[in-house]
Amino acid sequence: MKVLTFGEIMLRLKAPGHERFFQSPMLEATFGGGEANVAVSLANYGMDAEFLTVLPKNDIAECCIRELRYFGVDTKKIVRGEGRMGIYYLEGGANQLPSKVVYDRAYSSIALAKPGDIDWDKAFEGVDWFHITGITPAISESAMELSLESVKEAKKRNITVSCDLNYRKNLWKYGKKASEVMRELAKYVDVAIANEEDVQKSLEITVDVNVESGELDREKYRALGNKVLESYPNMKCIAITLRESHSADWNGWAACLNDGKDFYVSKKYEIRDIIDRVGGGDSFAGGLIYGLNHYEDKQSALEFAVAASCLKHSIPGDFNRVTVSDVTKLMGGDGTGRVQR
């Protein structure tokens, strides 16, 4: 099973610890991006994972590629082009002070990329599963057109397509609403991943559910999933993540999955003293792709995804540096955090 993920990887510049921007004269530099984060998770689980993007021809991009290779992600299909590397700045939240992200992605290499820039015959060679998110079509009109081209080309080759809807209100700035684009892209998706806001903003599908209440109304979330699957008969299933934010460093975390026949709900984790929640959704997506391809039942696949994402909240950086063994131990109830000897 070979998985190809496609999107933008950025230079991540984070204020140290819980400091505000430039409270001290330094920023911690790493790399991250939704689709790359998924590829790293899959490589950590032993899957054949490839990452496709467009990067400039400079030393920072080379460092980024080397970082992906360190985790075992295949980078041979990365295209080099004009433009620059996107950047995002991060402040880590605590208690009632939320985390903050500032994007600097204009004129990045992938934002400038357009249909025809990628040879899809080469890109999809040997690929069984293709993963994309709603972030890439948000960054520019040409990236949106390239994203639509990618899923259409994937389906021409009978490749399974997963999409994390990932609505980002601060990125949709080129004149189109997210729903105008994502409702078209969703026609080519087999496995959808979202939260309630993603479904509402990206697909304009709503059900009266209240995540903040801390209670999962099974029938309402089942109805939300049913509405999506009825609107998009091409979809085989949709997974909806459920985050209850008590504060910036204390979240409840669970998910449900609807395949049109059965409705599955995961265990709920109370995650206190969060180290870094950025990449938590991507670690769920990576866990779900792994789970759907390694477990015979969808309940186990869902539990693997939620447990993997739970662990990511305790790891600094975008990447989920855990193994299958780490995840299955938590699935099995070993969440004490005791020293492993």
Predicted ranges, named:
Residues A49, T75, V161-S162, I193:
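Hydrophobic beta-strand scaffold residues
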Residues E153-T160, Y232-K236:
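A short helix->loop->beta-strand "cap" motif at the edges of active sites that frequently abuts
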Residues N158-L165, L171:
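Short beta-strand/loop segments at the ligand-binding rim of alpha/beta enzyme cores
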Residues M1-V73, A94-Q96, A113-P115, D273-I275, ...:
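Glycine-rich phosphate/adenosyl-contacting loop at the front of the ribokinase-like
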Residues L171-K261:
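Conserved phosphate/ATP/ADP-binding segment of small-molecule kinases
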Residues D48-I135, V327-R341:
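Conserved N-terminal subdomain of the carbohydrate kinase-like
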Residues T5-E19, N251-K267:
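Acidic-glycine-rich active-site phosphate/pyrophosphate-binding loop
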Residues Y264-D334:
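Conserved post-catalytic alpha-helical subdomain immediately downstream of the catalytic base
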